[in-house]
Amino acid sequence: MERINKIVLVVDDNHDLRYMVSARLVSAGYRVYGAANGCEALEQLEEHSIDVVLTDYHMPEMNGFGLLSVCRVKWPSTPVVFFSGEQDDIAHEAVERGAFAWVRKGSDLTMILDCLDLAIQESAHA
């Protein structure tokens, strides 16, 4: 998949992790915006045409489920991928609530890229 001009919004309250993931996504060809919590993510979604959201679950102000709920209403064609170290029950609940997928923090970059690519491809055909 051609990643040039595809935009990922990385949402995580851990600045260092957000920066590291963003840098890797940029090196893979994506354009990336970042947010420290769900409220900041909503601002980014309002300002930019985001292709996919990669979000943590535990964050201050608005957690990943809160962000997912708003995204499903305001940007239903924008896939949300959870990127978290949480237990499997949180992962299953995220998918049940409408997340495209869940990727465990620490996963291989190729796995993350494959998931983001697939999310964008499927949303383009929806």
Describe the role of every protein-language-model region:
Residues 1-7, 110-126:
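Non-catalytic signal-transmission and effector/linker regions of two-component phosphorelay proteins
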Residues 5-16, 21-25:
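Conserved acidic segment of CheY-like receiver
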Residues 29-36, 44:
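Short hydrophobic/Thr-rich beta-strand motif most characteristic of the beta2 strand and flanking loop
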Residues 37-40, 63-66:
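Acidic catalytic/metal-coordinating carboxylates
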Residues 56:
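Active-site residues of response regulator receiver
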Residues 59:
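Receiver (REC) domain active-site loop signature in two-component systems and cognate sites
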Residues 66, 86-114:
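Alpha4 helix (beta4-alpha4-beta5 surface) of REC/receiver domains from two-component response regulators
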